[in-house]
């Protein structure tokens, strides 16, 4: 299966799981609580190479994945919807779709709240004040509340890359240097 087909499959699985979880959370009136728990799950994945390996590696059996996720649910107190969701995903051998499901849940919840999502890449972590100012600026441009997903990528050297929907604003130092380099090649 080509790589593009694989990522579409993962995306489709992730979106179906996220959509189902969102509907259940909406019925229970716990969308915000579920979102907060999913953020905690993502932080755990990001902070642990072992957990990351468990999530992405097909080497682990369904039983091993289920036992590990059950222990995680117990240890960190994920109860109710998120605890059951994690166990179902593990039991069905779909842990590979967990990060995508978390991202899809965030997007569905934001859309439900009337927000749009901006993916921001920065060379350094943004302070709370910078993030607040960025949200206000983007709200002024789009006319909607904006949820910001910040990714730190030191390779952009400085500035920001902001993606909102199909629009991208690239003020990164890396892009400016590349543009300058091309301009100098044309002159020389």
From Swiss-Prot:
InterPro entries on file: ATP_synth_OSCP/delta_N_sf, ATPase_OSCP/d_CS, ATPase_OSCP/dsu
Q: Which GO terms describe its molecular function?
A: proton-transporting ATP synthase activity, rotational mechanism
Q: Could you tell me where this protein is found in the cell? A: Cell inner membrane
Q: Where are the transmembrane segments?
A: none
The UniProt similarity line reads: Belongs to the ATPase delta chain family.
Top-rank taxon, per record: Bacteria
A Pfam family this protein belongs to?
A: OSCP
SUBUNIT field: F-type ATPases have 2 components, F(1) - the catalytic core - and F(0) - the membrane proton channel. F(1) has five subunits: alpha(3), beta(3), gamma(1), delta(1), epsilon(1). F(0) has three main subunits: a(1), b(2) and c(10-14). The alpha and beta chains form an alternating ring which encloses part of the gamma chain. F(1) is attached to F(0) by a central stalk formed by the gamma and epsilon chains, while a peripheral stalk is formed by the delta and b chains.
Where mainly located?
membrane
The name on file for this protein is ATP synthase subunit delta
- Keywords on record: ATP synthesis, Cell inner membrane, Cell membrane, CF(1), Hydrogen ion transport, Ion transport, Membrane, Transport
Topological type in the membrane: Peripheral membrane protein
């Amino acid at each position: 299966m080509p790589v593009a087909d694989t990522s579409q499959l993962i995306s489709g699985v992730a979106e179906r799981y996220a959509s189902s979880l969102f509907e259940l959370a909406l019925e229970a009136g716990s969308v915000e609580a579920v979102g907060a728990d999913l953020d905690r799950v993502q932080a755990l994945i990001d902070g642990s190479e072992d957990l990351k390996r468990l999530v992405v590696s097909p080497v682990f059996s369904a039983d091993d994945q289920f036992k590990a996720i059950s222990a995680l649910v117990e240890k960190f107190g994920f109860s109710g919807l998120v605890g059951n969701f994690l166990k179902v995903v593990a039991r069905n051998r779909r842990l590979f779709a967990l990060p995508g499901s978390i991202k899809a849940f965030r997007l569905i919840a934001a859309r439900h709240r009337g927000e749009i999502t901006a993916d921001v890449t920065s060379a350094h972590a943004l302070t709370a004040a910078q993030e607040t100012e960025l949200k206000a600026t983007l709200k002024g441009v789009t006319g909607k509340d904006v949820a910001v997903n910040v990714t730190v990528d030191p390779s952009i050297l400085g500035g920001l890359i902001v993606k909102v929907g199909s629009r991208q604003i690239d003020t990164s130092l890396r892009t400016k240097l590349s543009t300058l380099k091309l301009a100098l090649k044309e002159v020389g």
